């Protein structure tokens, strides 16, 4: 955990907390343990972009939001990859999207196999097929 000082606007200094912030509880602990002014979330958001919403809610209310469902997680992964492909083109976009997909499947049944499968995604259709298989496997269909 790090609480470093960086120069802000004018003569204002903001102490930033960074490291191992993955949810609201760890963000709150960072504030309390370091006395920082703000918390940065890095790898804790990989494959979990909703973590920012969850942390904000926890810090404001002290309540944890329910876990994101597998359907929601796959919908976000799909949209994320579609947006990458929209801006980069499908060929380059899917090359870049592979690493993101690997983060989204972390913790799912057979995640090691799924991460390897992510490395072979070449088209958006490949992604859709993988998502269908994940949902069928996770939901027992």
Question: What residue ranges belong to the model's regions?
Answer:
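Single conserved hydrophobic/aromatic residue that forms the stacking wall/gate
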Residues: 1-13
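Alpha/beta catalytic cores of nucleotide-metabolism and tRNA/nucleoside-modifying enzymes
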Residues: 11, 15-17, 21-141
């Amino acid at each position: 955990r790090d609480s470093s000082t960086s120069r802000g606007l004018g003569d204002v200094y903001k102490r930033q907390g960074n490291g191992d912030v993955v949810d609201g509880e760890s963000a709150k602990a960072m504030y309390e343990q370091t006395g920082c002014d703000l918390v940065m979330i890095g790898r804790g958001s990989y494959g979990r972009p909703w973590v920012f919403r969850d942390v904000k809610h926890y810090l404001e209310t002290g309540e944890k939001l329910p876990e994101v469902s597998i359907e929601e997680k796959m919908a976000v992964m799909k949209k994320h990859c579609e947006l990458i492909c929209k801006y980069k083109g499908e060929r380059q976009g899917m090359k870049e999207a592979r690493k993101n997909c690997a983060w989204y499947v972390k913790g799912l049944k057979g995640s090691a196999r799924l991460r390897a499968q992510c490395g072979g995604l070449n088209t958006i259709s490949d992604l859709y097929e993988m998502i269908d298989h994940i949902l069928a496997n996770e939901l027992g269909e």
